[in-house]
């Protein structure tokens, strides 16, 4: 297993610090609003990582925190006349609901910032005692960035380079513009806690330092998050933590790429902010999950409804293949003969390549390419009349079903009952495309009657009318079957 380490700017073999065990910490959401697709991507990326590592036999402890005290949470609480705790709890619960729908496994430990205030105060005290931090006249506590010689090692830039073109919160009380807040002095209308230097609340960065140190013996094997967290959040985490413990915060740093919308940065100001639960009103959860797996996790991914529609078509092809295999396996008796050895070898080779792709920095994009090769191979077997009903054919289909079972374990896709999924897919596409089912059924009835009367011209006219409505027709032994183009 090799992973790209942001710190070293290269892929490295994953070697656990504690034999057989892995500690993974990923920065979670700030709980002030519903989760967007950027949150979903990060959650799914690290869900795949954890699934893969457990499949390989590692004892994984997966930690994902919640920031439940922050300016944005406080602002929303004040605006809505609620407490910060109520706001945070609402959106933590909403996050869990959304991730459950997307098939994201629960983290083993989910620390909330407000449960670790004493640990954060202790971190601040240690930094003050080491002269790595200072208290201002107003009661804020700041970290001295230049007291940490390695500051900038994650982003690969020096402190002076980081000052250029970076939005820095100004303060006349700072010794250096790059210094960042560890503790914010209490303000009216804000939650606050007692500390040796007065009431206040923690800064964002110290939260993760305290929680990660408390939840796993440092260094972590892997620390992860979105690429937008490299600076300042992860850079500041490193400076704080390593100034306290005098050893690395993490061995490997992993960062997923951002989500764009129609090739533009996703932001509320551009009006292209995509909330997970809004998308799931129009698409099945597995479609969004599958869409987010189609690009390598370190690359940006461009969200579009056209891309989601193409993902649906790909899903449909896979589930239709699974349904046909399941139907073939319903046979009560099988003929002897057939020749499956070459097909089985092809399936084994493609699944081995699928696994190699995942083990090469979680390359789901390449892995899915091999999965579609497997679908193509099985399609050939389904069309091979000399093989279809034989015992060798049964072996091929059972092998395929075992591969799909493993794909579901590893990627969390294609594990549903195929006919149920295909019906759900048809239903949500009917709703999304505002298809009048009664109109479709009336036209199908007219076409059926025209075919019975051998009026094929009229039958073709009805087919064309249905096509103009976005409906395709297939004539089967069981009658007309319609679906959405």
Swiss-Prot record:
Organism: Lawsonia intracellularis (strain PHE/MN1-00)
NCBIfam families listed in its UniProt record: cysS
Gene that this polypeptide is encoded by: cysS
UniProt-listed InterPro entries: Cys-tRNA-ligase (IPR015803), Cys-tRNA-synt_Ia_DALR (IPR015273), Cys-tRNA/MSH_ligase (IPR024909), CysS_C (IPR056411), Rossmann-like_a/b/a_fold (IPR014729), tRNA-synt_1_cat_dom (IPR032678), tRNAsynth_Ia_anticodon-bd (IPR009080)
Positions annotated to bind Zn(2+): 27, 208, 233, 237
Gene Ontology BP, a term: cysteinyl-tRNA aminoacylation
Catalytic activities: tRNA(Cys) + L-cysteine + ATP = L-cysteinyl-tRNA(Cys) + AMP + diphosphate
Protein name: Cysteine--tRNA ligase
PANTHER family, alphabetized: CYSTEINE--TRNA LIGASE, CYTOPLASMIC (PTHR10890:SF3), CYSTEINYL-TRNA SYNTHETASE (PTHR10890)
Gene Ontology MF terms in the entry: ATP binding; cysteine-tRNA ligase activity; zinc ion binding
EC nos: 6.1.1.16
């Amino acid at each position: 297993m090799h992973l790209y380490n942001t710190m070293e700017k290269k892929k490295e073999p994953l070697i656990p610090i504690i034999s057989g065990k892995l500690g993974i910490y990923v920065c979670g959401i700030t709980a002030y609003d519903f989760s967007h697709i950027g949150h979903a991507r990060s959650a799914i990326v690290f869900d795949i990582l954890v699934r893969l590592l457990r499949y390989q036999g590692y004892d994984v402890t997966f930690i994902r925190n919640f920031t439940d005290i922050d300016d944005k949470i406080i602002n929303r609480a004040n605006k809505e006349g609620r407490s910060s705790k109520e706001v945070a709890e609402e959106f933590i619960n909403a996050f869990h609901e959304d991730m459950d729908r997307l098939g994201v496994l629960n983290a083993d430990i989910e620390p909330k910032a407000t449960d670790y205030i004493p640990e954060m105060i202790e971190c601040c005290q240690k930094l003050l005692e080491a002269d790595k931090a200072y208290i201002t006249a107003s009661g804020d506590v700041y970290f001295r960035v230049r007291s940490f010689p390695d500051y900038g090692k994650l982003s690969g830039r020096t402190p002076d380079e980081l000052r250029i073109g970076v939005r820095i919160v100004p303060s006349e009380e700072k010794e250096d513009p790059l210094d960042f807040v560890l503790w914010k002095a209490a303000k009216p209308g804000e939650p606050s806690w007692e500390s040796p230097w007065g009431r206040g609340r923690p800064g964002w960065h110290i939260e993760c330092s305290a929680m990660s140190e408390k939840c796993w013996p440092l260094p972590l094997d892997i620390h992860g998050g979105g690429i937008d967290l490299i600076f300042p959040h992860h850079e500041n985490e490193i400076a704080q933590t390593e100034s306290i413990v005098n050893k690395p915060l993490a061995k490997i740093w992993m960062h997923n790429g951002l989500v764009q919308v129609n090739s533009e940065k996703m932001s509320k100001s551009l009006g292209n902010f995509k909330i997970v639960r809004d998308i799931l009103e129009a698409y099945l959860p597995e479609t969004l999950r599958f869409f987010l797996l189609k690009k390598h996790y370190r690359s940006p991914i461009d969200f579009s409804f056209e891309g989601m529609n193409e993902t649906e078509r790909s899903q449909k092809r896979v589930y239709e293949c699974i349904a046909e295999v399941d139907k073939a396996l319903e046979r009560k008796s099988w003929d002897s003969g057939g020749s499956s050895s070459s097909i089985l070898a092809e399936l084994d080779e493609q699944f081995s390549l699928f696994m190699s792709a995942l083990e090469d920095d979680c390359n789901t994009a390449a892995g899915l390419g091999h999965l579609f090769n497997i679908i193509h191979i099985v399609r050939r077997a389904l069309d091979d009349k000399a093989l279809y009903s034989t015992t060798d054919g049964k072996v091929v289909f059972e092998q395929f079903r075992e591969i799909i079972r493993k794909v579901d374990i590893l990627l969390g896709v294609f594990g549903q009952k195929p006919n149920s999924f295909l019906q759900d897919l048809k239903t949500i596409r009917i709703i999304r495309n505002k298809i009048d089912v009664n109109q479709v059924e009336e036209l199908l009835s007219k076409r059926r009657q025209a075919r019975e009367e051998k009026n094929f011209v009229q039958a073709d006219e009805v087919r064309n009318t249905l096509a103009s409505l976005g409906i395709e027709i297939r004539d089967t032994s069981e009658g007309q079957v319609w679906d959405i183009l």
